[in-house]
Amino acid sequence: MRILVSNDDGVDAAGIRMLASVLREAGHEVTVVAPDRDRSGASNSLTLDLPIRLKRIDHYTVSVAGTPTDCVHLALTGLLEFEPDIVVSGINNAANLGDDVIYSGTVSAAMEGRFLGLPAVAVSLVSRNHDPKHFETAARAAVEIVARLKADPLPADTILNVNVPDLPWNEVKGFEVTRLGNRHRAEGCIAQKDPRGNEVYWIGPAGREQDSGPGTDFHAVRTGHISITPIQVDLTRYQALEKVASWVGGLSAALDQPA
């Protein structure tokens, strides 16, 4: 298969290098289009106020001065001379579980691929303290998932968010289909002062696990399983439509009132 690989940790990150290498060893034609530096947390952002510069590192690798979404968007709308069969994003060097997907550049790169018409997979290694040990396990998982998608494609609107426990392959207990869990509210920002006495702030840590019981991505990884969560671009909360329609009725009544 022709595979477009991207990430949010940057084109030189260990995870993307391992992913591209193992996919090539499996016989796939791999092209890497990835940010020139770490763009974690960039979510679905596109660069619209500046031209996007790039560097062709070799015939199969392009470094982009932009976001993960920029990378996939450019690749699929004119940068590449061919249409890939699938987009695989990763391997992220930490979890993308539950609410993490809202902020994740790794997931957003996959989402952009799906938005532009291709099957898409986001792969993350759930390491401790951002100190990943077993990228080869996550890469092996990606190879198996890509092979399965080739043999038995999923519905066209499906994005697979894959989280892999940081274990040797022979210690992984299996694959598990999950839903997204969620976290408690994020911890507070961190206030400091720069050398000139000016206020500066750092975004604080993500919240702790909240909804993380059986069936969630958190639980699967915690019990040694590879979590596969199908997600989609449509963010509509369908179960709330009837309630909100009734609520909007109260707003509509205001139109009958004199100004």
UniProtKB/Swiss-Prot annotation:
It comes from the Bacteria. One of its GO terms (molecular function) is nucleotide binding. Its EC number is 3.1.3.5. It is found in: Cytoplasm. It is an enzyme of class 3 (hydrolase). Binds 1 divalent metal cation per subunit. Its main location: cytoplasm. Its cofactor is a divalent metal cation. It catalyses: a ribonucleoside 5'-phosphate + H2O = a ribonucleoside + phosphate. Nucleotidase that shows phosphatase activity on nucleoside 5'-monophosphates. Belongs to the SurE nucleotidase family. PANTHER family: 5'-NUCLEOTIDASE SURE, 5'_3'-NUCLEOTIDASE SURE. This is 5'-nucleotidase SurE. It comes from Stenotrophomonas maltophilia (strain R551-3). The lineage of its organism: Bacteria, Pseudomonadati, Pseudomonadota, Gammaproteobacteria, Lysobacterales.
